[in-house]
Amino acid sequence: MGKIIGIDLGTTNSCLAIIEGGKGRVIENSEGDRTTPSIVAYTKDGEVLVGAAAKRQAVTNPKNTFYAVKRLIGRKFGDAEVQKDLDLVPYKITQHDNGDAWVATADAKKLAPQEISAKVLEKMKKTAEDFLGEKVTEAVITVPAYFNDSQRQATKDAGRIAGLDVKRIINEPTAAALAYGLDKKGGDRKIAVYDLGGGTFDVSIIEIAEVDGEKQFEVLATNGDTFLGGEDFDKRVIDYLVDEFNKDQGIDLRKDPLALQRLKDAAERAKIELSSSQQTEVNLPYITADASGPKHLNIKLTRAKLEALVDDLVRKSIEPCRIALNDAGLRTSDVQEVILVGGQTRMPKVQQAVADFFGKEPRKDVNPDEAVALGAAIQGGVLAGDVKDVLLLDVTPLSLGIETMGGVFTKIIEKNTTIPTKASQVFSTAEDGQSAVTVHVLQGEREQARFNKSLAKFDLAGIEPAPRGQPQIEVSFDIDANGILHVSAKDKKTNKEQKVEVKAGSGLSDSEIQQMVADAEAHREEDKKFQELVQARNHADGLIHSTRSAIKEHGSKVGGEVIGRVEASLAELEAAVKGDDKNQIEAKSKTLEEVAQSLHMAATAEQQSGSTGAGAGSSAKVDDVVDAEFTEVKGDKK
């Protein structure tokens, strides 16, 4: 069995880890960095850039550079959270045929968020393969604990498009707890994992216990907000800068994608700087121009001002902590340790808010950028048998049930139920003689079905006609270890049954996924061919240069016929290098090598002939030389 790699697929950055010698290890990417920006860009010449390369060119290519797409994955275009982002990103968010939120390039090519995420996963996969020296096909990928079924399915689809068999979807706070607690001694304890990342927020209350020599990680409760993270903090800074500039210059920079991208980079840098300093300056020369000439943005930002701008966002993260503790039946004093995960937790105000709520300082010995990937690798190690004596008991973050008469949401599996799990409930018909029922599967906490997330609808037909209330329809829910749901409905009298693995109305169809897998595979083949073409061109360029140097140096020593053949072959190769036909370039290179060989041989023969003549002359002179006799001279005596 090959390695099962662990991937933290983040909103802002992603991280890769493996198990080596029984311990987790973060793997550096090709740029030597331990995290990779979750950014994908499409260039004018059709090249796809991922990570740091995509981030570097974002300012000059804002409409084709996609970041923070994790906030769109598994979501509908009409969702309030998606609508909020429409005017705040320089790229276009569009509606797919099934109502999902997709993105579009400047030339109107529509892309699913899963496709963008798959590009990041492909880079992670390639990084692992380069490090391990073997093919990698299996992975454990993390998601926010509060991701619903659609978002989990979409993340698995992204893995599939990238050529990865996703062995397990694991919640980010749980992964961080695994990374933190695996080697810790000190008996049973309860910990809180506060995970404020680039685009999502989770909090999980987890009990770590020794049970029969096995370390058990049991999630007691989880809560969160899948649209709260560092991106929202950045946006507050961007809004402030835009408003200040508008007051000063009367120009709204929100309408300029290029300016918006520069502002995003500057806002992120300023926010990071203010975690370690009290004041910073945002200086963006030539941010825009009007009839009077170019305009420059220069605004001072203090830590106090930043904290005022994001105060409500920080407070918004505390309420889920209160709910999670309540769901776990615990008080803050019952929590022994608080772990901070996610880059946004480096902000002093966030750390202070967490310390104030839990009544204790959060631990600083956990790397907030790497803990989640390390935990995913540990889970991969457990599945592969490389890590022993670890049991992970996770929970479903939201209640699951069906719509019943009157639009009521009837829960079958309550939130924070340990998974995997199964539950059944018996229902009946609402009308006399009813021969079929529609099962509408939902996820959420509202009493009214219409306010919860619709996951699927399916029909159970062939029910024997009977007065209302008599037929016995057993609806069973089965959640696997990935938190993905399977539902069945069975008529207990006729034993007719309908089963479905819940595939939300949102999400990609199998044919769409297969097409994207094929596209990704074709792109990998395309990249390989591109590399081969570049190598052929580089070899040809070197050959052209060395041949021209040989003509210049030795051309006079060989016949004009040889030079003519070489020049003709050179011209053919130079023409081939301008094209994209690798085989043509290689063939013309081979021809030039063969033709130029006579030039090199003639030049070598000329050299040897010259050195032979020089040797004979030297030898004659040597014979005339008389060896001198030397006497040692001591002092003045000669």
Curated annotation (Swiss-Prot):
Protein induction: By stress conditions e.g. heat shock.
Superkingdom of origin: Bacteria
Record Pfam families: HSP70
PROSITE patterns named among the record's database cross-references: HSP70_1, HSP70_2, HSP70_3
Transmembrane regions: none
InterPro entries attached to this UniProt entry: ATPase_NBD, Chaperone_DnaK, Heat_shock_70_CS, HSP70_C_sf, HSP70_peptide-bd_sf, Hsp_70_fam
GO molecular function: ATP binding; ATP-dependent protein folding chaperone; unfolded protein binding
Region (Disordered): 601-624
Keywords, comma-separated and alphabetical: ATP-binding, Chaperone, Nucleotide-binding, Phosphoprotein, Stress response
Residues found modified as Phosphothreonine: 200
Family note: Belongs to the heat shock protein 70 family.
HAMAP family, A to Z: DnaK
Record's function text: Acts as a chaperone.
Protein name per UniProt: Chaperone protein DnaK
Origin organism lineage: Bacteria, Pseudomonadati, Pseudomonadota, Gammaproteobacteria, Lysobacterales
Gene expressing this chain: dnaK
